[in-house]
């Protein structure tokens, strides 16, 4: 430890914070020595320089004696309201602030074993509790583990643990290959330091090497070899004078103790299913506590091995042991020993102390870690909380990065968008994105996108080798097919079949497959959108009224629009995306989600109108309800003597032949056939079709409900984790299959999916290629630039807003975005679709969000009680590419797809609309309008923004959304893309209505021109700021620094924090332990 820095305790009260250069070489700099660069800054209050220098000299000359503590305490008491840097915090700063190349410390499994008597005779180590993140206890008499719960500790046990660490043996980075060798080493160290009498070594060794019984083992059925064998307890064995010489006694002890010890894990350990909860590199921390009758003072040892070693059956699971804490004490204090064991086990499961335990260099580092824990611990009044109540683990754990970062001296860790800039509510502004930085060069952004995505091109294919990708393909395929059929049908009605269902299938397949293969963000799904449909209808009517060739006019609009998009790509216009804040994103995505929900119910209501319910039907008068087909009045074909035809023969005969050459029985005609051939439907039941509407709504709501339920099944308590995850991943596919089977079993003739079975244009008046000239006057080619401007705005807004939503920080995408590359391919595909007279395609918000949700990854191993952590999204190109290839092949799968009821697919539409609204802050704020104040959730923005301001912001967002909805439903829908662009202007105007503080929580702060310069200044200020002041402004980026009161544990000590390690007065130590603590 000669190279370790010596820390001047007095320096910590001078409000000095070391910069990175000083911290980097702290092993060779003596902090107490005057360094001009370090001490140029002075305290804010006025003091005489001579007095300050005098105090520094006194501290150095007295070798950091106790007097310095008293002086510092007096000084701190005079300025207690000013932020202080405790010596423990300063020490932890050096421990956690070290930059080494070693990997992060592994996950720890902590096990608490207590020395208990079995059958009143044998003493064994019995496992009573275990920790990974939360505590699990062995239920008394239940032979089962308790549910994971938050460990509640008594404050007294933490102080006793601190005393144990001060007085016991601390052995760091020791080497041992077996448990007997390790126990021997600990006993010898205790004897060398005078903490253990030599004649007690054998007894301690015998006790520590007793058999370990874990909860996974069943009741012990003794074998024949064990019958008659009795092993006395340590006290009786050593108290018997007939045991022979000490040497013989030692041999007997060793042989009997080592019977159950093996360096290899047992079969029960290898079969333990609890290993699934641990990562592969996990290590163990064993805590052994118990009471014995041969010790007068506690036997305390904390050991950290240089390398983790497998110590046989010491641990419940077959993981190597790194830490060992031993506490053996006199009889009568078993409860105190148990609580101390729980305290050290809980500390080892704490992320900050866990890192300190791995990096500690001496006893004082460990004590500083305990002091840091005590600084953060929360105390509950004894009369207001029952400690026997087990606290359920929270759904989301607070990140320890804030605590670690406070000591590491680094910048604020950006996790999931929770930075000071965005107020900790995720979805931060886009000004920091590298993808949105304007290069100022021709096609600079496009070139950077290509360079950024090219290294990941190969991994975009093999990263899809997971069963989760299969479920995503099937789910998105059915959603895409349904959308293509729906849009194709509407487009056919709007354009007189110049573009129909087949064109929709072909365009979706070609555009989507090419985009997913080469675009910057392959997770984005291309589809036709409502605004595009409105534009196509208006364009067709305009061409029809002015005798223009619709497809040629549309071709030139597409070419002009593609050219404008390419100009936007070349000029890096995508940097404007940084002005699309949460307000714009949520307004647009919520509108699209509401459209999906509205269309799903609209289609079901239309279906109910087509197949109405007979509300006047009465069971007692069922003879009054009938329907018959009568022949037309001029000719009565039903009474002819000619041949009568069966209904199945009718479709092959023309109506003319039927009327003049043949006769048939009208009573056998179907409803459609009767109307087709001029018959009359007579009866009061002719307008009603029984059960179809009711069955359709059952399929519709059943598909939606089961999809939602099975998607949430991952967090349920039933079935193993693997089964729950599999059901959740295939939730939508399973729902579709289940209700298709139900529909087939019931046998009601519900409307089914209709897919074109022939590959040819829908209209015979068009081909697969549109000539650019010949159909319209020459000037139409130039005039097409005007409507093309509207299309360009629509394409740009739709594409980039969806791209922003897909690339949100909370999705944790690792391969980067490609805004310019995406828009480039949309423009190229627009040219292709214009020449082939196929629909135009752009990013679809709801389906893209559904695609991302179906590919989300979570941790495979999570501690009991801990929610699986979201790792990111499986970024690849395979799912999207295969979805669109299957869409193109759907023409050949018509015989299979025709069995899928349309209400089932409408239920999938409803699910996608509702699912895409989950987690949207706008929806959370809408719910607040209906909640009483006391029942409102603890959202971060409710802590810092007055509720009336929150409601005002929500009202303005609802107003904009309502205007957009009204606009899209009227003839003025042609300017819909312009109004979406107007959302950005509305958000800019909110800067005059709301403060930047409020907007930083409710929305994103719009980036400023000199933002980078301001951020650099902010970083410099952070380096100069006080380390120990509370960082509550991380939740409140615009709040003022508020002084905090910190009373560090070290001020209360009698011993200097970093003085030379002097031998402890053993008698005084023993007296102190007996009088004040269980240790």
Swiss-Prot record:
Broad class of the protein's primary localization: membrane
Coiled coil regions in record: none
Extracellular side of membrane: 492-501, 543-550, 610-692, 746-779, 837, 895-901
InterPro entries registered for this protein in UniProt: Band3_cytoplasmic_dom, HCO3_transpt-like_TM_dom, HCO3_transpt_euk, Na/HCO3_transpt, PTrfase/Anion_transptr
Expression by tissue: Isoform 1 is specifically expressed in pancreatic ducts and acini. Also expressed in parotid acinar cells and in the colonic crypts.
Disulfide bridge partners, by residue number: none
Intramembrane residue segments, as ranges: 961-986
Polar residues: compositionally biased ranges: 251-260
Modified-residue entries (Phosphothreonine), positions: 249, 254
Record keywords, A-Z: Cell membrane, Glycoprotein, Ion transport, Membrane, Phosphoprotein, Sodium, Sodium transport, Symport, Transmembrane, Transmembrane helix, Transport
Subcellular localization: Basolateral cell membrane; Cell membrane
Regulation: Activated by cyclic AMP.
Composition skew (Basic and acidic residues), residue ranges: 53-70, 1062-1079
A cellular-component GO term for this protein: basolateral plasma membrane
Pfam families named among the record's database cross-references: Band_3_cyto (PF07565), HCO3_cotransp (PF00955)
Membrane-crossing residue ranges in chain numbering: 467-491, 502-520, 522-542, 551-571, 586-609, 693-710, 726-745, 780-807, 820-836, 838-855, 878-894, 902-918
Sequence segments annotated as region (CA2-binding): 1002-1004, 1030-1033
Cytoplasmic side: 1-466, 521, 572-585, 711-725, 808-819, 856-877, 919-960, 987-1079
Positions of post-translational Phosphoserine modification: 61, 65, 68, 223, 232-233, 245, 256-257, 262, 1026, 1029, 1034, 1044, 1069
Topology of the protein relative to the lipid bilayer: Multi-pass membrane protein
Role noted for this protein: Electrogenic sodium/bicarbonate cotransporter with a Na(+):HCO3(-) stoichiometry varying from 1:2 to 1:3. May regulate bicarbonate influx/efflux at the basolateral membrane of cells and regulate intracellular pH.
NCBIfam families with a match to the protein in the record: ae
Similarity field: Belongs to the anion exchanger (TC 2.A.31) family.
Protein name in the entry: Electrogenic sodium bicarbonate cotransporter 1
Gene designation: Slc4a4
């Amino acid at each position: 430890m000669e190279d370790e820095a010596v820390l001047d305790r007095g320096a910590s009260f001078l409000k000095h914070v070391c910069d990175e250069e000083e911290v980097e070489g702290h092993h060779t700099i003596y902090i107490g020595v005057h360094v001009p660069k370090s001490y140029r800054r002075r305290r804010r209050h006025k003091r005489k320089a001579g007095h300050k220098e005098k105090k520094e000299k006194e501290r150095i000359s007295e070798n950091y004696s106790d007097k310095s503590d008293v002086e510092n305490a007096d000084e701190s008491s005079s300025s207690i309201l000013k932020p202080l840097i405790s010596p423990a915090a300063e020490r932890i700063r050096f421990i956690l602030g070290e930059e080494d190349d070693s990997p992060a410390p592994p996950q720890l499994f902590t096990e608490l074993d207590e020395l208990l008597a079995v059958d009143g005779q044998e003493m064994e180590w019995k496992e009573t509790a275990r920790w990974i993140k939360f505590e699990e206890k062995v239920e008394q008499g239940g032979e089962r583990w308790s549910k994971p719960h938050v460990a509640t500790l008594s404050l007294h046990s933490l102080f006793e643990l601190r005393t144990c660490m001060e007085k016991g043996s601390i052995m760091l980075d020791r080497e041992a290959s077996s448990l007997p060798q390790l126990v021997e080493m600990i006993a010898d160290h205790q004897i060398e330091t005078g903490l253990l009498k030599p004649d007690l070594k054998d007894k301690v060794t015998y006790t520590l090497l007793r058999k370990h019984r874990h909860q996974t083992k069943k009741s012990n059925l003794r074998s024949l070899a064990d019958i008659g064998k009795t092993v006395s307890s340590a006290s009786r064995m050593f108290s018997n004078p007939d045991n022979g010489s000490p040497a013989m006694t030692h041999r007997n002890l060793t042989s009997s103790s080592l019977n159950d010890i093996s360096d290899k894990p047992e079969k029960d350990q290898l079969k333990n299913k609890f290993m699934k909860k641990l990562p592969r590199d996990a290590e163990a921390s064993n805590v052994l506590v118990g009471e014995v009758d041969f010790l007068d003072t506690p036997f305390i040892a904390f050991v950290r091995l240089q390398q983790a070693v497998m110590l046989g059956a010491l641990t419940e699971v077959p993981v190597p042991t790194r830490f060992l804490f031993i506490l053996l004490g006199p009889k009568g204090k078993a409860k105190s020993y148990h609580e101390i064991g729980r305290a050290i086990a809980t500390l080892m499961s704490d992320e900050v102390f866990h890192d300190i335990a791995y990096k500690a260099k001496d006893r004082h580092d460990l004590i500083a870690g305990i002091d840091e824990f005590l600084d953060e611990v929360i105390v509950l009044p004894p009369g207001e909380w029952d400690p026997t109540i087990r606290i359920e683990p929270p759904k989301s754990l607070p990140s320890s990065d804030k605590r670690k970062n406070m000591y590491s001296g680094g910048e604020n860790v950006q996790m999931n968008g929770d930075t000071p800039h965005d107020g900790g509510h995720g979805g931060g502004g886009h000004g920091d994105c590298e993808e949105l930085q304007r290069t100022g060069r021709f096609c600079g952004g496009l070139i950077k996108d290509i360079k950024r995505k090219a290294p990941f091109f190969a991994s975009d294919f093999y990263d899809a080798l997971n069963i989760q990708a299969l479920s995503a393909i099937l789910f998105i395929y059915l959603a895409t097919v349904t959308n293509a059929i729906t849009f194709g049908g509407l487009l056919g009605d709007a354009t007189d079949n110049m573009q129909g269902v087949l064109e929709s299938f072909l365009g979706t397949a070609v555009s989507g497959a090419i985009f997913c293969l080469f675009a910057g963000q392959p997770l984005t799904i291309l589809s036709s959108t409502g605004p595009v449909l409105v534009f196509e209808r208006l364009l067709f009517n305009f061409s029809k009224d002015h005798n223009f060739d619709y497809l040629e006019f549309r071709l030139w609009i597409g070419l002009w629009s593609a050219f404008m998009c390419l100009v936007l790509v070349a000029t890096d216009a995508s940097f404007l995306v940084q002005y699309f804040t949460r307000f714009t994103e949520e307004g647009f995505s919520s509108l699209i989600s509401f459209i999906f929900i509205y269309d799903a119910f609209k289609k079901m209501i239309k279906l109910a109108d087509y197949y109405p319910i007979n509300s006047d039907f009465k069971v007692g008068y069922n003879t009054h309800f009938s329907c018959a087909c009568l022949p037309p009045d001029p000719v009565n074909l039903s009474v002819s003597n000619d041949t009568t035809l069966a209904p199945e023969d009718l479709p092959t005969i023309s109506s003319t032949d039927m009327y003049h050459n043949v006769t048939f029985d009208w009573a056998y005609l179907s409803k459609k056939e009767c109307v087709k051939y001029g018959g009359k439907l007579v009866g009061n039941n002719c307008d009603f079709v029984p059960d179809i509407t009711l069955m359709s709504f059952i399929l519709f709501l059943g598909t939606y409900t089961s999809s939602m339920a099975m998607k949430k099944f991952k967090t349920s308590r039933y079935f193993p984790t693997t089964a729950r995850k599999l059901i959740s991943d295939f939730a939508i596919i399973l729902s579709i299959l289940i209700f298709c089977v139900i529909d087939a079993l019931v046998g009601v003739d519900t409307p089914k999916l209709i897919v074109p079975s022939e590959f040819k244009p829908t209209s015979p008046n068009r081909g697969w290629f549109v000539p650019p000239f010949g159909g319209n006057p020459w000037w139409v080619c130039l005039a097409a630039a005007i409507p093309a401007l509207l299309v360009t705005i629509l394409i740009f807004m739709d594409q980039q807003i969806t791209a922003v939503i897909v690339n949100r920080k909370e999705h944790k995408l690792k391969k980067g975005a490609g805004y310019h590359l995406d828009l480039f391919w949309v423009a190229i595909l627009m040219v292709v679709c214009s020449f082939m007279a196929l629909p135009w395609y752009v990013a679809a918000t709801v389906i893209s969000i559904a695609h991302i949700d179906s590919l989300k990854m979570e941790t495979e191993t999570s501690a009991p009680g801990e929610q699986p952590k979201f790792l990111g999204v499986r970024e690849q190109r395979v799912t999207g590419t295969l979805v669109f290839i299957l869409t193109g092949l759907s023409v050949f799968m018509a015989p299979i797809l025709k069995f899928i009821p349309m209400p089932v697919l409408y239920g999938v539409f409803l699910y996608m609309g509702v699912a895409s609204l989950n987690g949207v802050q706008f929806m959370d704020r809408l719910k607040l309008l209906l909640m009483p104040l006391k029942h409102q959730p603890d959202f971060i923005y409710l802590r810092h923004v007055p509720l009336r301001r929150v409601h005002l912001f929500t009202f303005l967002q609802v107003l904009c959304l309502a205007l957009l909805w009204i606009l899209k439903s009227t003839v003025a829908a042609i300017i819909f893309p312009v109004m979406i662009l107007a959302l950005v202007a509305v958000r800019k105007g909110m800067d005059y209505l709301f403060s930047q503080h409020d907007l930083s929580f409710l929305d994103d702060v719009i980036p400023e021109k000199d933002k980078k310069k301001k951020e650099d200044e902010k970083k410099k200020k952070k380096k100069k700021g006080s380390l120990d002041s509370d960082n509550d402004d991380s939740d409140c980026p615009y709040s003022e620094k508020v002084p905090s009161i910190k009373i560090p544990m070290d001020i209360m000590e009698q011993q200097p924090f970093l003085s030379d390690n002097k031998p402890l007065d053993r008698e005084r130590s023993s007296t102190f332990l007996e009088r004040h603590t269980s240790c």
